[in-house]
Amino acid sequence: MEKAVWKLSPQLWNADLESSAIFLTFAHQIILTHMSYPICFVSLGPGDPELITLKGLKKLRQADIIYCPATISKSGQLLSRAARIIEGLEIEKSVVQFFTLPMSKDRTKVWKVYDTLYEKAISARDKEKKVVIVAEGDAGFYSSIQYIYDKFKENRIEVERTAGIPAFIAAGALAGL
């Protein structure tokens, strides 16, 4: 009985290598999509660090990067209520990165900042970083951060939103209502 001998031509071998490379690239993208951490939106509450939810605090403590909103004063000083809340929670300062929002009626400048933040967050997430984006009050209630949240959802990027205490609820409690 004669044995069958299979010979591959160099062209077929090269085509097979190219197919394998394409497959591995595709598989890597699937793994990144399904194995990466969701981008988390954490609500910081009305300003008192003690009023953050336990779930929000846990997300902040686990984060590799926390994107925090700030503004620049007329004197050039960086201002951030969100950063003061985070500082009060004793979160490591090295994980906090600021995104500076211009105080202007022209919202197109703000959208550009959010578009840049979107790209940075995606890049960090693709490097297997746990990404958190914070907002004062509740990130899902009357928050401009909703713009970037919607952009992630439209592009099928996995996101989580951690609820917080809105200022009007805290004010009602303070007033005894």
Placement of each model-derived feature along the sequence:
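Low-complexity, intrinsically disordered or signal/transmembrane-proximal segments
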Residues: 11, 28-29, 34
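Serine residues within intrinsically disordered or low-complexity segments
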Residues: 9, 19-20
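Alpha-helix N-cap/helix-start capping motif
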Residues: 146, 165-166
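Class I S-adenosyl-L-methionine
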Residues: 34-49, 54-57, 61-158
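Beta-strand/loop-alpha-helix module characteristic of Rossmann-like adenine-cofactor folds
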Residues: 36-38, 157-160, 166-177
